[in-house]
């Protein structure tokens, strides 16, 4: 039916003029934002004329008719008629030229910043543009003329989300569309005849479907026989961050077309999204073998190899055409290479502090998934006797499984990369006293790189040290302490920094009554492993045997901080404190090891407790007070850590006579008595102030 001709308004002319001068429909145009220049009054939007965009609906049959899906506009109170758009193609659809078809490309990694498509989205057949939807219609009024008017979102300040589209053109970082939360989808064309409806951005999907990504489209694609269609839906899943679903679809596409390099490259992209870097490398290598001239697979493989710290292999793939495919990535590669060289040089001269600096710099420069660089930091911490840092850094080492065959034989600091990982692991296992694990790790390193002298020497050392330690343990259990000490000494000759062997030999000296030598070995063990509690306990016991009560109390106090609930340590500390007081001539009559806070129920009981010799700490509280509830557990812990002090608790609600006698008006209040005299009163104490006061008066 012919449309009636309406006079063109001034806003229409301005809109057409700006649209014609600023908007184009170039296929390879970078990411863009549609510019609406209609009436600033209405929130409704109309279909811009002369533009082809990625469609949000699809044709349902091969006939000339098609239906447009409706979408929700950006203004919630005003419904909008959805736009039916045509799919981007490499040819000009108006001229009917279908000779040019886009080449199938694969996904880029998230870390790259180059103007290539995110995922391969080539179509297996040409598609027809959908009919243009009617323009929005406004009611007549004195502001806008009646009839059809170009409407804009010019007055809207609300931000719109960026949605990855599915066009076939080269858009830079994928096909980025501007929208209000609706995911666009291009028409499904299975190549035969009719197109299947696609409603990827439908707001009516259930939350469970959105969470899993297993939509009807996904289920249909996974059973499909058209590899291009399967790949297209896989790309949609990838763009939404549904990497598991995308991976399954790429697997299906590869099963249908095993020699297609783009499918394998896309599968690698999904694996990268799942942090399965080792598998992604293998997939890229398979893609390159399938199509040695496929630049996208070479580029993605180069980026992965940079992340793994494999700079030589990465350069080969980055410059496979004789020149770098991405100058920015080449700069990243060169930065990683520079710091790697400095790191290896510093390791060669055992400058472990520089090793830490350069390894960190290489990781920050781009080698953020390199196991050998992380293990190099572990080794540096170990050599600097910072075992706690080495252990925590060991947990951060990236797991590359399976380790790529092409990477395993490349060299790092003179040994195979994979062998170096086990080389360091053997050292840290031995330092922690897990000798059997150390032997297995050293054997693994030796199997991977049997010709490396450094690996062979470590394997021999670890094996001999483990044997010496096992022999020493057997002799110690048989109470042959002198022979056991000799066995441990043999292990220390091979590994002179092993805290476990020093501690074991100290135990032998203790049993033989050689307290001074026991203390010396404990000092050595603590030098190499400061947080190791066993040598601290043995040194405290040796100091007690030699009646060095001050040193013994100091060691036991350090132990009680590490082991606050250990009753044996608390009791040993109490006896050492009593002995120290006695050696100073202080009165120690009737001092008993308590270990628990004593609750007072009567004024007579309170007065009796005040007359006890030594230091008494009284905690005045009420059961209902929040601050009292917070401080009570801390008072209990102080009682365990300072066993020579009497800790008493008074609930002034239950015993108001005591509160009145002591003039307690605010809780919590702590009073400290020494030999029956009050020396300190603290109202609402903090934990720090309370502990400082207790420690001060316990000495």
From Swiss-Prot:
| Residues that bear Phosphoserine | 39, 42
Question: Out of the domains of life, which is the source?
Answer: Eukaryota
Family annotation (SUPFAM superfamilies): Thioredoxin-like (SSF52833), TPR-like (SSF48452)
The UniProt regions of compositional bias labelled Basic and acidic residues, in chain numbering, are 9-20
Q: Does the keyword Phosphoprotein apply?
A: yes
Expression induction: By salt and ABA treatments.
The gene name reads TTL1
The scientific name of the source species is: Arabidopsis thaliana (Mouse-ear cress)
| Name of the protein this chain belongs to | TPR repeat-containing thioredoxin TTL1
Annotated region Disordered: the residues are 1-211
Biological processes per GO annotation: abscisic acid-activated signaling pathway; positive regulation of abscisic acid-activated signaling pathway; response to abscisic acid; response to osmotic stress; response to salt stress
């Amino acid at each position: 039916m012919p449309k009636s001709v309406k006079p063109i308004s001034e806003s229409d002319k301005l809109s057409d003029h700006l649209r014609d001068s600023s908007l184009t429909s170039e296929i390879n145009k970078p990411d863009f934002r549609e510019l609406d220049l209609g009436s600033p009054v209405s929130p409704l939007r109309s279909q811009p004329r002369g533009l082809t965009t990625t469609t949000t609906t699809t044709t349902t049959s091969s006939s000339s008719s098609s239906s447009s899906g409706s979408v929700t506009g950006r203004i919630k109170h005003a419904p909008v008629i959805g736009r039916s758009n045509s799919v981007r193609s490499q040819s000009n659809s108006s001229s009917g030229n279908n000779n040019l078809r886009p080449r199938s490309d694969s996904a880029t990694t998230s870390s790259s910043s180059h103007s290539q498509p995110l995922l391969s989205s080539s179509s297996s057949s040409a598609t027809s543009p959908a009919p243009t939807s009617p323009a929005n219609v406004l009611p007549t009024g004195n502001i806008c003329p009646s009839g059809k008017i170009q409407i804009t979102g010019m007055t809207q300040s609300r931000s719109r989300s960026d949605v990855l589209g599915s066009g076939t053109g080269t858009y830079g970082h994928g096909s980025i569309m501007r929208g209000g939360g609706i995911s666009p989808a291009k028409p499904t064309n299975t190549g035969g005849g009719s197109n299947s409806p696609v409603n990827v951005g439908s707001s009516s999907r259930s939350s469970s479907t959105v969470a899993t990504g297993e939509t009807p489209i996904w289920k249909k694609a996974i059973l499909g026989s058209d590899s291009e269609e399967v790949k297209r839906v896989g790309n949609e899943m990838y763009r939404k961050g549904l990497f598991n679903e995308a991976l399954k679809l790429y697997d299906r596409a590869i099963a249908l077309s095993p020699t297609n390099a783009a499918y394998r490259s896309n599968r690698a992209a999904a694996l990268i999204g799942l942090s399965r870097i080792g598998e992604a490398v293998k997939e890229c290598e398979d893609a390159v073998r399938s199509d040695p001239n496929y630049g996208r697979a070479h580029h993605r493989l180069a980026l992965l190899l940079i992340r793994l710290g494999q700079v030589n292999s990465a350069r080969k793939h980055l410059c496979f055409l004789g020149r770098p495919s991405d100058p920015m990535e080449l700069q990243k590669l060169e930065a990683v290479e520079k710091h790697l060289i400095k790191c290896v040089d510093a390791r060669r001269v055992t400058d472990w502090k520089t090793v830490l600096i350069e390894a960190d710099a290489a990781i920050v420069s781009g080698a953020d998934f390199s196991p050998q660089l992380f293990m190099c930091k572990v080794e540096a911490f170990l050599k600097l006797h910072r075992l706690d840092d080495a252990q925590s850094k060991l947990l951060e080492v990236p797991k590359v499984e399976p380790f790529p065959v092409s990477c395993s034989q490349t060299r790092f600091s003179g040994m195979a990369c994979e062998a170096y990982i086990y080389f360091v692991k053997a050292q840290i296992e031995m330092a922690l006293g897990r000798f059997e694990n150390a032997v297995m790790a050293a054997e693994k390193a030796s199997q991977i790189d049997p010709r490396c002298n450094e690996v062979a020497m470590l394997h021999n050392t670890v094996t001999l040290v483990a044997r010496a330690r096992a022999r020493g343990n057997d002799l110690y259990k048989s109470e042959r302490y002198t022979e056991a000490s000799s066995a441990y000494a043999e292990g220390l000759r091979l590994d002179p920094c092993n805290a476990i062997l020093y501690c074991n030999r100290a135990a032998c000296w203790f049993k033989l009554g050689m307290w001074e030598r026991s203390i010396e070995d404990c000092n050595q063990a603590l030098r190499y492993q400061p947080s190791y509690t066993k040598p601290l306990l043995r040194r405290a016991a040796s100091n007690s045997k030699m009646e060095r009560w001050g040193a013994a109390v100091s060691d036991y106090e350090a132990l009680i901080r590490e082991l606050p609930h250990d009753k044996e340590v608390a009791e040993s500390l109490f006896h050492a404190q009593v002995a120290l007081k006695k050696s100073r001539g202080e009165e120690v009559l009737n001092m008993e090891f308590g270990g628990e806070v004593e609750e007072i129920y009567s004024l007579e009981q309170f007065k009796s407790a005040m007359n006890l010799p030594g230091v008494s700490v009284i905690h005045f509280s009420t059961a209902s007070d929040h601050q009292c509830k917070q401080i009570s557990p801390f008072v209990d812990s102080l009682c365990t850590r300072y066993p020579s002090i009497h800790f008493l608790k008074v609930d002034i609600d239950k015993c108001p006579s005591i509160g009145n006698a002591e003039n307690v008006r605010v809780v919590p209040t702590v009073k400290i008595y020494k030999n029956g005299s009050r020396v300190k009163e603290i109202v609402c104490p903090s934990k720090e102030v309370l502990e400082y006061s207790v420690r001060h008066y316990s000495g």
